[in-house]
Amino acid sequence: MDTWKVGPVELKSRLILGSGKYEDFGVMREAIAAAKAEVVTVSVRRVELKAPGHVGLLEALEGVRLLPNTAGARTAEEAVRLARLGRLLTGERWVKLEVIPDPTYLLPDPLETLKAAERLIEEDFLVLPYMGPDLVLAKRLAALGTATVMPLAAPIGSGWGVRTRALLELFAREKASLPPVVVDAGLGLPSHAAEVMELGLDAVLVNTAIAEAQDPPAMAEAFRLAVEAGRKAYLAGPMRPREAASPSSPVEGVPFTPTGPRPGRGPQ
């Protein structure tokens, strides 16, 4: 079976879901089921039992593995505090590390992310850091011992698709020196997820594209199928693009050549 690992955790599904932006918990549960997701990210701030509007979230997520995230953290210090709280509330050792000081474009801070990752690893967390598509930073995080790296495809919630493809191709080339690569943020269509998986990267994380669809469960199923198709295409070994056309049927033995009738075989 084609499984993958995040630290010691073995997973079958390569589609991770976010839990935000759904109309209600019932729709969220239907989407999770349609995606056959094993892991769902959840903001530590939403897990707090007295958080307004979020009562019942943990109950709604029963049966899946929770991945607490540090959404809302603007500095390494804030991220570490949220990660500790997430471990206390969920009992999970792993954490999706997000350090985002920029409220306009929601781009992650590479220096604070690196600093927070180092501290959390020292505290025995399994760290899954959200980051820009920076291969040098990815290798620095890998050297610290992060469980994954999570480069963005486009800004969070934009739905722009794989705008960073050229840089993600570098991640695919360097996979042997990296932990699992999970592409996170900006995917708007199932075809975007398939494109990422065709590169040979390990998984994708999707939230807004599913939660804001007119039919979230149907879109979740579409993303699941796209991830599976992209992964199978990668494993099948795609053909290499050519610089010129190549006929799919042999031309030898036909009465005409591409430049006209063969000698002696014109109209009778």
From Swiss-Prot:
The active site is at 96 (schiff-base intermediate with dxp). Its EC number is 2.8.1.10. Residues 258-268 have a biased composition (Pro residues). It is found in: Cytoplasm. It is an enzyme of class 2 (transferase). 1-deoxy-D-xylulose 5-phosphate binds at residues 157, 185-186, 207-208. GO terms for molecular function: thiazole synthase activity. The keyword Ribosomal protein does not apply. Gene3D superfamilies: Aldolase class I. Signal peptide: none annotated. Its main location: cytoplasm. Pathway: Cofactor biosynthesis; thiamine diphosphate biosynthesis. It catalyses: [ThiS sulfur-carrier protein]-C-terminal-Gly-aminoethanethioate + 2-iminoacetate + 1-deoxy-D-xylulose 5-phosphate = [ThiS sulfur-carrier protein]-C-terminal Gly-Gly + 2-[(2R,5Z)-2-carboxy-4-methylthiazol-5(2H)-ylidene]ethyl phosphate + 2 H2O + H(+). GO terms for biological process: thiamine diphosphate biosynthetic process. Keywords: Cytoplasm, Schiff base, Thiamine biosynthesis, Transferase. It holds the Pfam family ThiG. Residues 238-268 are annotated as: Disordered. CDD domains: ThiG (cd04728). One of its GO terms (cellular component) is cytoplasm. Belongs to the ThiG family. Catalyzes the rearrangement of 1-deoxy-D-xylulose 5-phosphate (DXP) to produce the thiazole phosphate moiety of thiamine. Sulfur is provided by the thiocarboxylate moiety of the carrier protein ThiS. In vitro, sulfur can be provided by H(2)S. This is Thiazole synthase.
